[in-house]
Regions:
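Conserved glycine(s) of the Walker
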Residues: 147-149
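A noncatalytic interaction/capping subdomain that flanks phosphate/NTP-handling catalytic cores
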Residues: 1-145, 154, 158-159, 169-368
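Residue-level detector of anion-binding/catalytic polar loops
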Residues: 162
Length: 368
């Protein structure tokens, strides 16, 4: 069976070989986009049975859990017990993936990066930014990792705005904003500040929070033991506890929790907020010129997407080499971004993180 997805006019995706429970699972993971009747495709992924041919050269895991192998004209990426492959030239209509690849991996490792690549080739940009829609139109909330994009966006939702995107926002060539498929991850500490989210937790989410708090005792107990090995173990346990305290919320569930609609695409942004972290407990807001923030926006996006562009480096080193340089579209995005945000009001916010995101929200509203 083939599933076709129209990602808000930014790209069309076809996934073939989808059978059984994977149909429902993939449809859920692709929210808010539903399977459509469109058969034209920008990105095509064929799910296949069996194992790939033996690689002529295999580059081992470099810390991201992935290995890359090559055969003449094709690169193969292995992760967990699955794999996916792409042809020389980084052709987005010739991607294969093992049916054993976890559905969440299929979306995060294959579909979403492929859509981003197509967007960049087609004259659009994928920003490392959340986005909300309020009475004044769409607003982008951009910034480096751990700057408060998700938290600030959800604080706006608490005040009546609608969440468009979390973490990644596509700017089509016409400037329209589009949501990529994927859930929202809500940190446990955020719930003390946002009542609608706290009150809307499911039983499973509440159980996860209890488990995360219990796991959080592990690092404290282990650090009481002597030696570097105990310290290293405590650090690993702290990472696990932090991941456990992040609640995965699908778009439709978030809409039900907050009483807001699910929105997948809007017109162009009217405001762009650059969030920066600072080590003092005060918030400052200033205006910036659009042309002065382009480098920062592209740098943040490139860093967060380095796992994709890094594949080109590995594939070029392998023997036989495979050319995947087409996966890196940041130069094209840099050239396009100036036009796409030329008429957008840009402000920069410096605030501590973590903090009550309502403070950041209110500072933005007071300035604009």
């Amino acid at each position: 069976m083939e599933l076709h997805f129209d990602i808000g006019g930014a790209a069309t995706v076809t996934v073939s070989g989808v059978e059984g429970r994977l149909i429902e699972r993939l449809s859920t993971l692709m929210q808010p986009w539903r399977s459509s009747d469109r058969t034209d495709t920008d990105v095509r992924i064929d799910l296949v049975q069996g194992d790939p041919p033996p690689a002529d050269d295999l580059i081992g895991d470099t810390g991201d859990g992935r290995r890359l192998g090559t055969t003449p004209g094709r690169a193969w990426i292995f992760i967990d017990d699955g794999w996916w492959s792409i042809a020389d030239g980084a052709g987005l209509e010739d991607i294969e993936a093992s049916v054993r690849l976890r559905p969440s991996r299929l979306v995060s490792e294959v579909i979403r990066p492929a859509v981003m690549t197509h967007v960049g080739r087609a004259g659009g940009v994928t920003l490392h930014a959340s986005a909300v829609v309020d009475a004044d139109g769409p607003m982008l909330l951009a910034g480096w990792s751990e700057s408060g994009k998700t938290e600030t966006a959800l604080a706006f939702v608490e005040a009546g705005s609608t969440l468009l995107t979390d973490k990644w926002t596509v700017l089509r060539p016409d400037g329209g904003l589009v949501r990529l498929p994927g859930p929202v991850y809500v940190r446990g500490w955020l719930l003390q500040h946002l009542g609608s989210l706290r009150d809307g937790l499911t039983t499973r989410m509440r159980a996860q929070r209890i488990a995360a708090r219990t796991a959080g005792l592990g690092p404290w107990m282990v650090r009481r033991l002597p030696g570097d090995a105990a310290s290293d173990l405590a650090d690993r346990l702290a990472v696990i506890a932090d991941l456990g305290d992040r609640l995965r919320v699908d778009p439709e569930r978030l809409a039900a929790m907050t009483g807001t609609p699910v929105v997948g695409a809007t017109g162009p942004a009217t405001r762009l907020v650059i969030l920066r972290s600072r080590p003092v407990d005060s918030i400052t807001v200033i205006d910036r010129r659009p042309e002065d923030v382009i480098d920062d926006l592209i740098a943040s996006s490139a860093f967060e997407r380095r796992s994709t562009s890094d594949l080109a480096v590995r594939a070029a080193y392998a023997d036989p080499p495979v050319d995947l340089r087409g996966l890196d579209v940041h130069a094209a995005e840099h050239a396009a971004l100036g036009t796409l945000i030329a008429a957008v009001r840009v402000i920069e916010v410096r605030a501590p993180f973590p903090t009550d995101p309502r403070r950041v929200r209110d500072a933005i509203l007071a300035h604009v």
